[in-house]
Amino acid sequence: MATAIRDVGVWRQTRTLLLKNYLIKCRTKKSSVQEILFPLFFLFWLILVSMMHPNKKYEEVSDIELSPMDKFSLSNVILGYTPVTNITSSIMQRVSTDHLPKVIVTEEYANEKELVAASLSKSSNFVGVVFKDTMSYELRFFPEMIPVSSIYMNSREGCSKTCDAAQYWSLGFTVLQASIDAAIIQLKTNVSVWSELESTKAVIMGEAAVVEIDTFPRGVILIYLVIAFSPFGYFLAIHIVAEKEKKLKEFLKIMGLHDTAFWLSWVLLYASLIFLMSLLMAVIATASSLFPQSSSIVIFLLFFLYGLSSVFFALMLTPLFKKSKHVGVVEFFVTVVFGFVGLLIVLIESFPRSLVWLFSPLCQCAFLIGIAQVMHLEDFNEGALFSNLTEGPYPLIITIIMLALDSVFYVLLAVYLDQVIPGEFGLRRSSLYFLKPSYWSKNKRNYKELSEGNINGNISLNEIVEPVSSEFIGKEAIRISGIQKSYRKKTENVEALRNLSFDIYEGQITALLGHSGTGKSTLMNILCGLCPPSDGFASIYGHRVSEIDEMFEARKMIGICPQSDINFDVLTVEENLSILASIKGIPANNIIQEVQKVLLDLDMQAIKDNQAKKLSGGQKRKLSVGIAVLGNPKILLLDEPTAGMDPCSRHIVWNLLKYRKANRVTVFSTHFMDEADILADRKAVISQGMLKCVGSSIFLKSKWGIGYRLSMYIDRYCATESLSSLVRQHIPAAALLQQNDQQLVYSLPFKDMDKFSGLFSALDIHSNLGVISYGVSMTTLEDVFLKLEVEAEIDQADYSVFTQQPREEETDSKSFDEMEQSLLILSETKASSVSTMSLWKQQVSTIAKFHFLSLKRESKSVRAVLLLLLIFFAVQIFMFFLHHSFKNAVVPIKLVPDLYFLKPGDKPHKYKTSLLLQNSTDSDINGLIEFFAHQNIMVAMFNDSDYVSAAPHSAALNVVRSEKDYVFSAVFNSTMVYCLPVMMNIISNYYLYHLNVTEAIQTWSTPFIQEITDIVFKIELYFQAALLGIIVTAMPPYFAMENAENHKIKAYTQLKLSGLLPSAYWVGQAVVDIPLFFVVLILMLGSLFAFHHGLYFYPAKFLAVVFCLIAYVPSVILFTYIASFTFKKILNTKEFWSFIYSVTALACVAITETTFFLQYAVTAVFHYTFCIAIPIYPLLGCLISFIKGSWKNMPKNENTYNPWDRLLVAVIMPYLQCILWIFLLQHYEKIHGGRSIRKDPFFRALSQKAKNKKFPEPPINEDEDEDVKAERLKVKELMGCQCCEEKPAIMVCNLHKEYDDKKDFLHSRKTTKVATKYISFCVKKGEILGLLGPNGAGKSTVINTLVGDVEPTSGKIFLGDYGSHSSEDDESIKCMGYCPQTNPLWPDLTLQEHFEIYGAVKGMSPGDMKEVISRITKALDLKEHLQKTVKKLPAGIKRKLCFALSMLGNPQVTLLDEPSTGMDPRAKQHMWRAIRTAFKNKKRAALLTTHYMEEAEAVCDRVAIMVSGQLRCIGTVQHLKSKFGKGYFLEIKLKDWIENLEIDRLQREIQYIFPNASRQESFSSILAFKIPKEDVQSLSQSFAKLEEAKRTFAIEEYSFSQATLEQVFVELTKEQEEEDNSCGTLASTLWWERTQEDRVVF
């Protein structure tokens, strides 16, 4: 009985999701640790910043009078001046003789350039004077003598008599300035004022106690606190959008999830996390130097509310994004931007306060304003307390309220946006949905149901829809009427569904069939509410799917398994089931029981504790099916539920669905026709979005099938013509479908079923015709599907965006006969016969072209190399400009009053103030005030002796009367760096003004800036050379490690099997890589030398660098080739080795340069060692040695070391390494390169005879099947035969493979697992042998051994006419065809380029290649895809390409590993027809592995089934059916009017004909019976009796079929699990399913 409609509470779902989110946080340790550590890291970092930059609190300082002006501060000064004129000479004469006698010495220079040049060789006691004219001059001191800062105002920190401003007084600057000013005044007026100027006093102005706040660390603290909480929002947004990206959220809603529970679960989890973090951070912040005066609770409130609001801000962003990789970056970026907006608001003092709160909806701004207020309160020793929450310009109470309101606003906005923003899936509400009464009123609305006649409208039911029996009338569960779905695809309108109408009934399993893109998944999405229909009507038990509220009710009855797997990656299987069971509303006390039942039903007990991300593809599908069936939902919607499963797993799912069928509705889509045939009661075939037919298997087969298949297992003496004549004698319409040495297959039409008895009787009588056994089976659904598809119009694209899969390209309307002809022509094409050297040259050029194209189109590697180049060039340019701008870093400072003093009428600005004027003369000073007015200086009279009371001011002037004139005391603020020289300039100009000269003296301070010193130049050059080494060594892995990628995708194996010579492969890559690396190195070295003209290029030493470079490039490239063989152990090979190269180069430079300061001998030892042992070092060592020996000014006789000594080893070693790498490359190629088909003219070692493998006789197995034993004897006989007429193309003799098992390492026991057990078989030319088996049976080991990827433990393999380990150069096989399971295709190359590469490798000429490509594209319908890159192709086209590449060059042996994987039924049939046709010419053989039994039946001449590493059986399909099949299947369709009594009589009749027949699950109109093989003694008698019963009873039609190969396979593979446990066979039961993860299953 189906479970009642679920109605689960919000709080229960919230608790469940909270547990799920908690488990996810615990399992995703990387992100969780970052969320916890990042805020704490930021907090401790800010505490450190606050400790390093505390607020500077200065006590009150009184005035400090400096010592009198001391002319001896300029003692021993050399005073150079320019230009030399009479006036300047006169001025300097007075300075040196009158003012500063015996103190300074003057020197004359013709111009300033000479003066600057002289300063380069002078000591710091040299001072320059540059006269601009008679009234203006520059004073040029060395930087160490005076402050050179371009900042006019300094801090009070540590300032006393030695502060920057006072140095102008103490170090002689003002003395020299006063002396020159006095000389100029005397020159102008003939009056000496030197005594007055010399009497000038200097006083450091006293300052009040003050707290000095450093803006920069405060800004850092503010912005970092804003960013500190961003990891929470970052990872939350990523988690939510990732679930949306994987469609988990929408499917959870289908299962009954409430939106409220979804949002609430994340809110509660992060609220708890932020609560704890905020509490911890608040305690740390208040206990440290960050907020020591504040209340922990207040700080906690700020942190907690901001943390919440930032998380809710991230929630608000999630509905706006579809990709998780974008949302996190945007969230962090927006946080930073809004944080800086808030920082500007705080730092801009003039920002209008009325506008501040307009930014409060941005939580970052509100929080930053609040923290700024806390810091403001901390500055005044108050701290943020509850008592002052309402104080200050920005009260904290407002911040707290705004953050709380922001949180509520963000959550509501997140929920609203989630409802209205159109998404990829799910129904969306209107923008004002919350204003509609229907949203608040949940009253159910009833709609008038439509009858089937109305639903199906103008469809002729008799033609395509089979009427249901009377027992299903009134049980219509899902009604579909005129459903249409269209969408916009770029500029065109695509119709996914076109007027689709039919009913789905309760108690039945309904299958949706159709090729990829027909709209099956679209219909599923509409039925579960993921997307609305464009038009039409669909209801589920009366609930319309297009109405959101009604869909919510319908979803309570639905279990869904979409194409994409539903699971939470980091949760275990059991956790996934338990959590989703709770979300579905299963009672809490029943969850464990329900979950265990699902695990048991689907055979998942062994993996219940495995995380979902570690499951194979098939296991994930099982989990998705298990989730769908949880709680016994009334309706099951399953979209390709068994995709990626092996046959055994598929049968488990089938049994589960059949068991749960009663009183429920099950709808599934599939591409496996046998699955639909066995499992579904009704099949709906959809093509081009339209319904083609609906009905039971017997209805579809009888109406569209080709009839019965008569399969005969024949001996070698069979008279085929006579046998065909006999068949056609009884059934003229019979047609021969398939013929080989051991099997014949005929088709027998339905209309002649009454003649079957006579035919079978004749076959029994004429035993001399060579028929060993025969069987009959009804037409398959595959045939029905194909017949319907051929009739369909396929002239336009028709696929659904909602399936999210690439469109499976359709074949065109040409017949299969035309394709056969094309393939027959193709099968005759051969590779051109060319000489080995000509082929080698052709392969080299081909590999070079392919490698160049790959590099050109592989954007990741190109971007990496360009980025590294740009980084190096950017550093070069930056250092160049830094070096040249350093000389001009300090601009000349004009010492004028405007620097610090306001002009009359100006308002106070920054450090500009009025000049305080103190009158100490006891008389008026009107003349002086007049002078200040003339000079445009604002003055303020000051009569108090305490300058602190008038603070802040830049300076004051105390005027004292002397004998001749005023004498001044210059009182200056110690923070004003240039205030004292400016005051001296003012005083000098006053004296000049007082002497009636209106001109003013102008003075500049322009310190000497020397050229960069030699040591700095060396350090800079060493740094850039080391940087070159680090960057350039990081490049080769990005373009020279393509071998790793080729091995990973198995393209190299494919190339080798195609006849590629290993030496041609490596030379072809080197032809591109070596010149490319040369160009890069020359560019980088050229830029290094171009930007450093301080090097002298000694020809010999420069040639040494050149010779080193010539060998270094190929050496590094060859070493990179060798390193690429680590691809098996390293995931991201390029990135890993790039990092290793760079770190190694850095370590080498660091070690050699560090030891240079110790002792030369130690450095030399390291240098030699690195040159010998580390191939990436020699150029770096050579370059550094060259730099050390190439200074312009380097002494000629250097005793410390001989650069040639170090250059020599760096030059020679790359040449020796090249030779070593070539031999190593050859060695690694031999070990890891796989089998070489052709003899290599250069890598001779590869063609040497391999070591002989053990060849023991296999142990005697009494239980071995007789056919397997016969095959073994046949192989043994063929091995010893020297003159056999024709040897098999493939021969495997006693192949045995064991693997070491590392599981018992701790127990010190070395055990082995057996993959294959002495397998022997052969494949004749013209034969296709199918190799079947469950997971872990050993099929992959056999294939990998054949292609040379795996070495067998023992046994021999013969391909063509010689053994795989033979040293003979037999010309009979030049290449092997191989179509691996994973596509060995280069994603950035086109189809045509693939053909050209493989054709050239196989020796085809360009002309032949063009013709072959044309034939292939015609045969396989690839023409329209020729110019598309592989990454843009659908999976089916990729498989066609792999098959086509394997057939190029007419290989004698072809290995096909799952060739039709990922194709829809039509494409599979196309591929199967191509395979059959390609092997008609009897010149080639194929070994095919598959998990699709229908593929084996359709393609293979013989089939071998492997179980537990052994061959269980081998023979034709008919032979295996006859030998291992358990019986027949009888299905009878009754006429509608038959009564129950008549049915009982019919059943008794069947029991009479077949005494042991068992009735299967069936309906009143269809009876199904399973007939044991023992009951069918004669097919002729069986059909005769069934025909008689058909005439006697009301039987409309019947089918009588032999057991399928699928059933034989399942029976044979049941024994593997027991044998695995007992015999120690390789338990790789997940191998096949793991490989399916890379497959695209439609």
Swiss-Prot record:
ATP 2 binds at residues 1333-1340. GO terms for molecular function: ABC-type transporter activity; ATP binding; ATP hydrolysis activity. Coiled coil: none annotated. Expressed in cardiomyocytes, oligodendrocytes and astrocytes in brain, alveolar type 2 cells in lung and follicular cells in the thyroid gland (at protein level). Detected in brain, testis, lung, heart, liver, kidney, skeletal muscle and placenta. Strongly expressed in the basal cells of the seminiferous tubules, interstitial cells consisting of Leydig cells, as well as the tunica albuginea. The keyword Electron transport does not apply. Glycans are attached at residues 86, 388, 458, 919, 996. Keywords: ATP-binding, Cell membrane, Endosome, Glycoprotein, Golgi apparatus, Lipid transport, Lysosome, Membrane, Nucleotide-binding, Repeat, Translocase, Transmembrane, Transmembrane helix, Transport. It is an enzyme of class 7 (translocase). It is found in: Golgi apparatus membrane; Lysosome membrane; Late endosome membrane; Cell membrane. One of its GO terms (biological process) is reverse cholesterol transport. The chain crosses the membrane at residues 32-52, 220-240, 264-284, 297-317, 328-348, 355-375, 396-416, 864-884, 967-987, 1021-1041, 1071-1091, 1102-1122, 1138-1158, 1164-1184, 1207-1227. It catalyses: cholesterol(in) + ATP + H2O = cholesterol(out) + ADP + phosphate + H(+). This is Cholesterol transporter ABCA5.
